[in-house]
């Protein structure tokens, strides 16, 4: 598989000769469309063995005040009750598949390839939307018809993630509210960026945003702080990955995207010193 994707039109089909399972409204020839003053919004959930919270995620989508959306679920071949939950809710899911994949970003790419909406958003299988999330999004789409992407505020256990500060991207990834739950991108803009690069196992979203902002020079906006899209549960995908692997991914992304090598080395040194200092402090406290 190539490391770079030029367009969303050519994502490789599944390597499985036969999908394990698939379903949804599209399989019954029900296809939703964009309406005057009501753009179609695609919501994608990727899941693997997520039966603990998946129903809460689905329920939060059912409760949306704004109704012109399509919902896609990409399951990585779960072995718990995830597939049964999906089937129990198939009347409100536009399309779902359940098959083995190459990880979370492969699943994201499958969802992007299936999206028919004017805007696309991703919500993890343990997070939830506020009931007015898509209503707020639609308001911003109407106010800023030429904008490429929108970041909404997201609640975490310690407070609210808010804002969008693109000038920080060259030295920090903390320039936006949230990749999932709080981020929506115009479908046509997503096609220009391409897919998540599967070369990066843990931080392909950073590479995606770097290409979006630096390479493609796209324009985005953040909602007001209290215009909250959703709730981000504690302990996401990257929280389960060893710190050094995350750092390796970050350095590789910056290097591959042509950042100044001296800046990369400085950031590497800074983060190593910060981490060692943090470990030392925790050791003293114990």
Functional labels for PLM-detected ranges:
Residues 1-60:
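N-proximal low-complexity "stem/linker" segments adjacent to membrane-targeting elements
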Residues 59-68:
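Short, acidic, metal-binding catalytic loop of nucleotide-sugar glycosyltransferases
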Residues 75-84, 124-127:
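A conserved acidic beta->alpha catalytic loop
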Residues 98-115:
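Glycine-rich, basic loop-to-helix element that forms the pyrophosphate-binding segment
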Residues 120:
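Short aromatic/hydrophobic "clamp" motif used to bind/position activated sugar donors
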Residues 128, 132-163:
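Conserved donor NDP-sugar-binding/catalytic core segment of glycosyltransferases
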Residues 163-246:
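Conserved nucleotide-sugar donor-binding catalytic segment
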Residues 239-264:
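Catalytic core of nucleotide-sugar-dependent glycosyltransferases
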């Amino acid at each position: 598989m190539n490391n770079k994707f030029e367009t969303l039109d050519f994502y490789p089909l599944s390597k499985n000769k036969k999908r394990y399972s698939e379903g949804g409204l599209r399989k019954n020839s029900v296809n939703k469309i964009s309406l005057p003053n009501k753009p179609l919004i695609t919501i994608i959930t990727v899941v693997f063995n997520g039966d603990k919270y998946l129903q809460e995620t689905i329920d939060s989508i059912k409760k949306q005040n704004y109704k012109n959306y399509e919902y896609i679920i990409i399951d990585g071949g779960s072995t718990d009750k995830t597939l049964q939950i999906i089937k129990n809710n198939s009347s409100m899911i536009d399309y779902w598949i359940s098959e083995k994949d190459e990880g979370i970003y492969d699943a994201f790419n499958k969802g992007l390839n299936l999206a028919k909406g004017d805007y696309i958003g991703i919500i993890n299988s343990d997070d939830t939307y506020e009931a007015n999330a898509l209503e707020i999004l639609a308001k911003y789409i109407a106010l800023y018809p030429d904008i490429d992407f929108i970041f909404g505020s997201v609640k975490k256990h310690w407070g609210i993630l808010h804002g969008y500060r693109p000038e920080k991207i060259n030295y920090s990834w903390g320039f936006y509210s949230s990749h999932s739950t709080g981020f929506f991108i115009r479908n046509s803009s997503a096609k220009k960026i391409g897919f998540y690069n599967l070369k990066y196992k843990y931080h392909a979203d950073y590479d995606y945003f770097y290409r979006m902002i630096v390479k493609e020079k796209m324009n985005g906006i953040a909602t007001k702080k209290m215009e909250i899209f959703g709730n981000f549960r504690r302990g996401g995908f990257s929280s389960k990955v060893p710190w050094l692997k995350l750092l390796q991914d970050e350095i590789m992304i910056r290097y591959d995207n042509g950042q100044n090598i001296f800046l990369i080395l400085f950031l590497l040194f800074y983060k190593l010193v910060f981490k060692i200092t943090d470990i030392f402090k925790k050791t003293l406290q114990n």
